[in-house]
Amino acid sequence: MSTSTVELFVDPACPFAWMTSRWLLQAAEVREITPRFRVMSLAVLNEGRDLDPDYRRSTDQTWGAARLAVHIARTEGDEALSRWYTAWGERYHVGGDQDDRRAVAEQALADAGLPAELISAYDNVPGDEVDQALRASHAEAIDRVGDDVGTPVISFGDGAEGIAYFGPVVSPAPKGEDAGRLLDGLRALASIDGFYELKRSRTGGIDLS
């Protein structure tokens, strides 16, 4: 049986995107899909917006990991990005190692078996090739789903012609057949022309279990 690709656009710093990515990997174990992680950027998304100063500082700290992620995808491929993202998330989100993000990103390269010199892409240089690639990848996500959402963005179907939504936001990440059933439901919604949004307020924090 052939598998279909499900793309998930993430900012590596977003804990909710991390949870969604773990669900998608679980779903791939029980359904015939190939997960493909793509990169979007909370920093790009919030450029020019009037934000609370604390949130602005937090957002400005997300450039590096997103730059490195898109650079890995461009130079080493999707599978390498998946390995690095998992290594990064285990340290940054699960382990709570968030004091020196650049060091965490560098350690994740080693964990993922990737060249150490890739870390050079981490440092933000507006307008360089990595910056342009990050903005292009982010724009692809926004073109599919609209500009009033954040990360993650999930996309079903054939690339830019597919159907994309913000989310799903999950905590904890469903496992086993629960992960598969959630995927089934989302794919069913994506098959309905004219369906746009379904939402409820979160009642708890992040559960990384």
Outline where the language-model segments fall.
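Extreme N-terminal starter segment of soluble prokaryotic enzymes
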Residues: 2-7
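Structural alpha/beta surface segment adjacent to cysteine/selenocysteine redox centers
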Residues: 12, 18-105, 185-189, 197-200, ...
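Conserved acidic functional residues
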Residues: 11-13, 155
